[in-house]
Amino acid sequence: MTAVPGFPGAVGLSGLEVYPWPTADDEHGGSPHMHLACAECYVVVSGRGRLETLDHKGPRTTELHPGDVVWFTPGTIHRAINDEDLRVIVVMQNSGLPEAGDAVMTFPPEYLSPETYPDAASLLGADGNPSPERAQARRDLAVAGFTELKRQWRRGNRSAYEDFCAAAVRLVQPRLDTWEKTVNAGALAAAHTALRHIGALRHDDFTHLFEADVSRIAQPPRQTLGMCGFLRAYVEEGGTR
């Protein structure tokens, strides 16, 4: 097996089966959370559901049906709701950033400090392994915080959303140097490569075309516990060329 090039545009790709677990607000789905530097896109493969969001313009619900493409930008608190066997392909900007902490769940304020957030967000059970019970527990905590944020918004208190954003920024600030390196090595490098190719073509230099190749990654065999559901993350190390 040979390492393959990164995905086009340095995006991340995952197959997502949205959690079927019931929530306290009579829905089924995962943990509401927000990305601070990455846009995210859902390509709906099968099933039926909704994307519930809250941003600086207020709460919104977007239907999810097979064939739909829905995307949202940093600052969008979001959760996927599973109405019927919802499966999507997730396209994530800046591959590697969500794994490096660019995702903050909407826990109540007392769990949004650097001291309290890690334990609340942890998936590890008593045996030290990722646990579905822990995934449900942190989901329930995030839903409680999200429900309160929506309630505050509808009461006219816009500052609750802003306070969450400020707390999220404080949580991720120690990681920003790592994020910058990831973007420099990924999306920015990909953009520079494209610009070099364009510059070469202006001078009739098309030698990069002789480096053309085809890569393939099979469906990952193992699922992991994500924020929104069961994930199968496609990683370049698992591909062939």
PLM segments and residue spans:
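Double-stranded beta-helix
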Residues: 85-157
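Acidic/histidine-enriched, beta-strand-rich ligand/metal-binding domains
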Residues: 64, 76-77, 81-89, 94-108, ...
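Short, conserved beta-strand element in jelly-roll/cupin
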Residues: 36-51, 91-95
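C-terminal non-catalytic accessory extensions
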Residues: 180-241
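An accessory alpha-helical subdomain
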Residues: 126-205
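Conserved short histidine dyad/triad with adjacent acidic residue
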Residues: 2, 15-35
